[in-house]
Amino acid sequence: MTLDSYNIFNDEYLFNMPLSPLPKVLGNFETGQSVLTLTTPTLTPTTTRNIEDTLGHLLSDTQTDRVAGCAGFAVPKVLPNAMGAIDALGMGIPTCVSSLPLQQTYDASLGQGSESEDSNASYNDTQMNEEQDTTDTSSAHTDSTSYQAGHIMVGSVNGGGVNNFTNVLAAVSSSRGSASVGSSNANTSNPPARRGGGRRPNRSTNMTPEEEQKRAVRRERNKQAAARCRKRRVDQTNELTEEVEQLEKRRDSMRKEFEALTNSKKQLEYLLATHRSTCQKIRSDILSVATCNGLIAPDGLLSAGSSGSAASSHHNHNSNDSSNGTITGMDATLNSTGRSNSPLDLKPAANIDSLLLHIKDEPLDGAIDSGSSLDQDGPPPSKRITLPPMSTMPHVHLSTLITPTGASSGSLQTPITSTAPVGFGSAFPVTSNGSSINNINSIGNSMNSPTLNALNKVPKERPNTLAFQRPLGQMHLTMANNKAGGPTQIQGVPIQTPSTGTFNFDSLMDGGTGLTPVSGPLVPNSSSTNKHPLELPTPTAEPSKLVSL
């Protein structure tokens, strides 16, 4: 059985006693023995002096200094009769303790600890007492010290733990007392106790001013570097914290925006669901546009003109869907299927070319035919009659168109150049007697052809092209060439009146003089039933066929 098997000498039991002077003593013993050094200690004059100072400090430490370091608690002294009392208790401890081997062992321990202390000068007494209290080296030194101090634990098998600890304290106190008495004559100096509180011991007395200055500069530089490091870490932590806060705020704002957009989406979906039936009705009724011959026309016009079978053959249904004649794709967004429809085919049909040939020429006054207007309100004006070209009139002679002008015997031959009319009535509003009625009836009978009758049944539409002539420019050119004598002919027809140069622009604009050039159709108005003052009866009793602007 070895001494290490006894648990009473472990650190937790031995060094946790705050009132015992043993921890400090043992701490001084194990100052340099608990830490391994990487370099071999070299004995120098400085090291020798440090060893001497340490020995003097340890050997001159009296009982009064020990009591002063224990917070004012006086440790009871161990007297020689106490050793006799301990021996009387039957503990088996011998009363004769040799002081010479103990002193030699103590001196050896001190010397060894001093040499290693200089090599490990970075540790002081306070730090060693704080850090080395729980090491296994402490119990080992305690066992070795107790074993060397007179074989204290020889007969302690039958004793208790408290008695054994008391024996250890008594042995240590007696050994320190004998060591102090033996070394009092050798060293009488009492240096002050070393008071260090840092990484290295305070040895300013042995340092030169240059070394002290270097140490101060180095410490200041280290402090500044440590402060900068701490500041950098704090700044980095603050930046990361601010970034996290900003990201959290952004996340909250995006979450709110997402919720708002979700609510808007739900509302729009609800509105679409509720208005889907209404949109179907609008697409089928309101937006339906009918087409006729490739052109867009209202439904009323087609319904009015669709009674005849001949008119229905001219209708060309052009739409996006082939089932009916309505355009349901006016707006691509209203299409329920969402696909884009093909553009409308608004090219005119093939029979439009034949219809355009029968469109009458535009008159000089720029009036619009009431039959071709789709959006004209109010009562329609009097009808305008268009006569065919004179080459196609079999019974009409140029002599019937010669109109006298008052007392003069000259006549005006008015040329008539026009095309086939678009529509006209079956009877002229001109009422007269004589052969003129028969001539007009013969002209009307010659124009009653099946083609014109078929055209009368078709509803009139606004044409997209107008082919008309402006012979007035030729008349102006003729008047410019004959400034001295006035106009003598209109479109190659000579004016045979003696008063050709006596009329000015105002008389031409007033009309009714017989000199008004007419290149378009002759359209008698409602005033033709009443005789104009200038329209005098001719010897042949023919009515006047002059037109006033």
UniProtKB/Swiss-Prot annotation:
SMART domains in alphabetical order: BRLZ
Superkingdom per UniProt: Eukaryota
CDD domains, A to Z: bZIP_Fos
InterPro entries: AP-1, bZIP, bZIP_sf
Region annotation (Leucine-zipper) ranges: 240-247
Phosphoserine sites (modified residues): 342
Region (Basic motif): 214-233
Biased composition (Low complexity): 177-194, 304-325
Presence of the UniProt keyword Ribonucleoprotein in the record: no
PANTHER family: ACTIVATING TRANSCRIPTION FACTOR 3-RELATED, FOS TRANSCRIPTION FACTOR-RELATED
Domain bZIP: 212-275
One annotated Gene Ontology cellular component of this protein: nucleus
Keywords: Activator, DNA-binding, Nucleus, Phosphoprotein, Transcription, Transcription regulation
Organism, scientific name: Drosophila sechellia (Fruit fly)
Matching Gene3D superfamilies: 1.20.5.170
Family listed: Belongs to the bZIP family. Fos subfamily.
Record PROSITE patterns: BZIP, BZIP_BASIC
Primary localisation category: nucleus
Known role: Developmentally regulated transcription factor AP-1 binds and recognizes the enhancer DNA sequence: 5'-TGA[CG]TCA-3'. May play a role in the function or determination of a particular subset of cells in the developing embryo. It is able to carry out its function either independently of or in conjunction with Jra.
Protein's name in the database: Transcription factor kayak
Region described as Disordered: spans on this chain: 108-143, 177-234, 304-345, 367-389, 510-549
Subunit and interaction comment: Homodimer. Heterodimer with Jra. The kay-Jra heterodimer binds more stably to the AP-1 site than either of the two proteins alone.
GO molecular function: DNA binding; DNA-binding transcription factor activity, RNA polymerase II-specific; RNA polymerase II cis-regulatory region sequence-specific DNA binding
Compositional bias of kind Polar residues: 108-127, 333-343
GO terms classed as biological process: embryo development ending in birth or egg hatching
Subcellular localization(s) per the UniProt record: Nucleus
